[in-house]
């Protein structure tokens, strides 16, 4: 059986505890995967903007990204597919969680980033992200 694709999560998997990776080593690994015609896919709850900051333009163009927990798929920097909730469903969800946003750590994920109520904390996320990354 041939391996055609390798997919990985980011935080706590590809990235170390400081939210970083060895860029030179990773580029060599990508070279080897490309020689074998194996696609490398990043699957993450993060948005594409964070991926651009982490990988830079050159590496971005060599990978596929499934971001925002599957809401968008990019081949390099090109959007291939996007799925979103319709307005009525968003209104229903917001109404259901009204007043309980902090209890459930409600986050709205949009094209330009993720949004939560000011002052909300995310203890599990903070284990894998630095404060600077969480604020971006």
For each feature predicted by the language model, list its residue ranges.
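Short, small/acidic-rich helices and loops at N termini and domain boundaries
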Residues: 64-67
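Short glycine-/acidic-enriched loop or helix-start segments at secondary-structure transitions
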Residues: 17-18, 51-53, 76-77, 118
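Asp-based phosphoryl-transfer active-site loop
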Residues: 2-19
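Substrate-recognition element of Asp-dependent hydrolases with the DxDx(T/V) motif
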Residues: 30-52, 69, 106-110
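Metal-dependent catalytic neighborhoods of phosphoester/phosphodiester hydrolases
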Residues: 50-60
């Amino acid at each position: 059986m041939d391996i055609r694709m390798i997919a990985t999560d980011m935080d706590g998997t590809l990235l170390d505890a400081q939210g970083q990776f060895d860029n030179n080593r990773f580029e060599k690994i990508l070279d080897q995967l490309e020689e074998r015609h194996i696609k490398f896919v990043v699957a993450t709850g993060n948005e594409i903007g964070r991926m651009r900051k982490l990988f830079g333009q050159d590496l971005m163009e060599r990978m596929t990204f499934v971001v925002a927990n599957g809401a968008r798929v990019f081949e390099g920097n090109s959007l291939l597919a996007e799925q979103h909730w319709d307005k009525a469903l968003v209104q229903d969800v917001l109404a259901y969680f009204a007043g309980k946003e902090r209890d459930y750590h409600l986050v709205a994920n949009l094209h330009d980033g993720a949004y939560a109520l000011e002052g909300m904390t995310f203890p599990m996320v903070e284990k894998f992200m630095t404060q600077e990354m969480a604020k971006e």
